[in-house]
């Protein structure tokens, strides 16, 4: 597929301004420390506005009141989003209690947002609280380093509670990969943790002085679950086990979902299989993929800079051979693996270690005390008594992990009393949205605030057609950057303008096919009318066990995307 249009290894031309910024930043320091003391604005100025992203933060404002503040001649209400580095989504109950307190005491919204990258975010951190949040995280063994911008982001790992030993091994590799690919600059420690400046020169042996051309995402996957949506990621290690023990990984490279509306040089792409590698080569291969993308990725056009575009430009075999050369290995043929699903199994599951795991459905990952459903308080009370850990899933849910039989009833009572185990439909469990309005500066349409009521309407359609217990993997993302992973859904809505979305159909339940645009720039009533007709047909005409996405392809309703670089827009 990728050998059709091999191009230059390096794209020549004028570098993007982001490259200048990184080069001049003194290894990500900029003037952030000085800017922190500027009380005349609630935001960060100049390059610092972008540099703080390398430190795990985005500058945002409340878009619900932006126009009102402008009328009053006030600057936007600037506040930061902070995203924690949490490989595999594992967090101790001590850490949870600390983040709960910070959210309550020091953020505008008072909530904790679980993300589909297995971590948590704080929204609404005022500038005066930015340094304290980093220091709070450090005090409990956490940080926000490299969770945004042109680095290897938070490393995902399947939250599989059944295969306890395999999960433990895979999780250790997720942590090792995360640590190995971290930036070496001391900027984070100097600015946020008040560590002394050292006379030595900074070096970045893996990432380089200008870091990566674009964001880079990595996963460790344990089949048959594809809960982490490997095809949304640049580099994926698929666990291969023998007799229940991890022996190596299949490597898949070049997935990614972000596009730009109308820009046919951009496309969503599934990851390509490179081959199998024994465990001992994991870090060398991870480094080789990252450094190849570092050196060959497009630094002249950020919209064409991700690994998926590099792979298409130079050709899969060329990229693979370079990874082999740098890692000093030859990939073995891909070992057999298959995926059967990617949803979370809500409720109690017993692990092979005889401990119990309770997966709680958290709609859109937003942890807050709602009227009659004090979710945030409930999780805090569980954290106070639970001796195990919490695991954040890539479906924005939360697992109370490793609960001994003796504690099970007590934890279930707390969960039920706080509305954490309320019954929800299969459709709601399989629906997801990004944050979007009011805090995301890129949002074009509502997502998190739109999805709950939209799901109600889709549930009504399923009931109308006699299949109330069925589900369709449904995702809403507020803009084409695609944080809601709509480009791997059976029904994907991509925000185009307030109240308007592009409707994508034809993905599948296991997340291995990109959905094609079916209708463009349509309103909610139009979307529901289309879904009513198509779900009605699915209910009547489907084959045994056939998911909605597979049905739309088989019935000729939508053409499957087979070669995204060439047929995503056709």
From Swiss-Prot:
Pathway: Sulfur metabolism; hydrogen sulfide biosynthesis; hydrogen sulfide from sulfite (NADPH route): step 1/1. The keyword Transmembrane does not apply. One of its GO terms (biological process) is cysteine biosynthetic process. GO terms for cellular component: sulfite reductase complex (NADPH). It is an enzyme of class 1 (oxidoreductase). This is Sulfite reductase [NADPH] hemoprotein beta-component. Belongs to the nitrite and sulfite reductase 4Fe-4S domain family. It catalyses: hydrogen sulfide + 3 NADP(+) + 3 H2O = sulfite + 3 NADPH + 4 H(+). Its cofactor is siroheme; [4Fe-4S] cluster. It comes from Salmonella gallinarum (strain 287/91 / NCTC 13346). The keyword Repeat does not apply. It holds the Pfam family NIR_SIR_ferr. Component of the sulfite reductase complex that catalyzes the 6-electron reduction of sulfite to sulfide. This is one of several activities required for the biosynthesis of L-cysteine from sulfate. Its EC number is 1.8.1.2.
């Amino acid at each position: 597929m990728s050998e059709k249009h091999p191009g230059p290894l390096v794209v020549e031309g004028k570098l993007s301004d982001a490259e200048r910024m990184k080069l001049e930043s003194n290894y990500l320091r900029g003037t952030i420390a000085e800017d922190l003391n500027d009380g005349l604005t609630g935001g960060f100025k100049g390059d610092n506005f972008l540099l703080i992203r390398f430190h795990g933060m985005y500058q945002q404002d409340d878009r619900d009141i932006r126009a009102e503040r402008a009328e009053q001649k006030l600057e936007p209400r600037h506040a930061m989003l902070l995203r924690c580095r949490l490989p595999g989504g594992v967090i101790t109950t001590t850490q949870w209690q600390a983040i709960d307190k910070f959210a309550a005491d020091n953020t505008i919204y008072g909530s904790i947002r679980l993300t589909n990258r297995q971590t948590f975010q704080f929204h609404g951190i005022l500038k005066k609280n930015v340094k304290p949040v980093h220091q709070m995280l450090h005090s409990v063994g956490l940080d926000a380093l490299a969770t945004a911008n042109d680095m290897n982001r938070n490393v995902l790992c399947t939250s599989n509670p059944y295969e306890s030993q395999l999960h433990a091994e895979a999780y250790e590799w997720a942590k090792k990969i995360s640590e190995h690919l971290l930036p070496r600059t001391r900027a984070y420690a100097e600015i946020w943790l008040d560590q002394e400046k050292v006379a030595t020169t900074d070096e970045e042996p893996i990432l380089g002085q200008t870091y990566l051309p674009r964001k880079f995402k990595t996963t460790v996957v344990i089949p048959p679950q594809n809960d982490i949506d490997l095809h949304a990621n640049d580099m994926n290690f698929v666990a291969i086990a023998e007799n229940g023990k991890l022996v190596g990984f299949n490597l898949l490279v070049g997935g990614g979902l972000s596009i730009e509306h109308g820009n046919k040089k951009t496309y969503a792409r599934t990851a390509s299989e490179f081959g199998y590698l024994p465990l001992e080569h994991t870090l060398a291969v991870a480094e080789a993929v990252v450094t190849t993308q570092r050196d060959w990725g497009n630094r002249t056009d950020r919209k064409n800079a991700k690994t998926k575009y590099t792979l298409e430009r130079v050709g899969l075999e060329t990229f693979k051979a370079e990874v082999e050369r740098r890692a000093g290995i030859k990939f073995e043929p891909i070992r057999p693996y298959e995926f059967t699903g990617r949803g979370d199994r809500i409720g109690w599951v017993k692990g092979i270690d005889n401990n119990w795991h309770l997966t709680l459905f958290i709609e859109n990952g937003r942890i807050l005390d709602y009227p009659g459903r004090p979710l945030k308080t409930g999780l805090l009370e569980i954290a106070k008594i639970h001796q195990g850990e919490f695991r954040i899933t890539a479906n924005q849910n939360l697992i109370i992990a490793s609960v001994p039989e003796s504690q099970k009833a007590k934890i279930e009572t707390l969960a039920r009393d706080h509305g954490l185990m309320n019954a929800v439909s299969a459709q709601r469990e399989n629906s997801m949205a990004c944050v979007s309005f009011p805090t995301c500066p890129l949002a074009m349409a509502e997502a998190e605030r739109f999805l709950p009521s939209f799901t109600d309407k889709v549930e009504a359609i399923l009931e109308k057609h006699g299949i109330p217990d069925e589900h369709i993997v449904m995702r809403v993302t507020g803009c084409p950057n695609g944080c809601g992973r709509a480009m791997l859904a059976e029904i994907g809505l991509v925000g185009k303008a307030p109240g308007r979305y592009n409707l994508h159909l034809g993905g599948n339940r296991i997340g291995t096919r990109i959905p094609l645009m079916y209708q463009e720039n349509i309103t909610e009533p139009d979307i529901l009318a289309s879904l009513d007709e198509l779900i009605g047909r699915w209910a009547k005409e489907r084959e045994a066990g056939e998911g909605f996405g597979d049905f739309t392809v088989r019935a000729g309703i939508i053409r499957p995307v087979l070669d995204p670089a060439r047929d995503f827009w056709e």
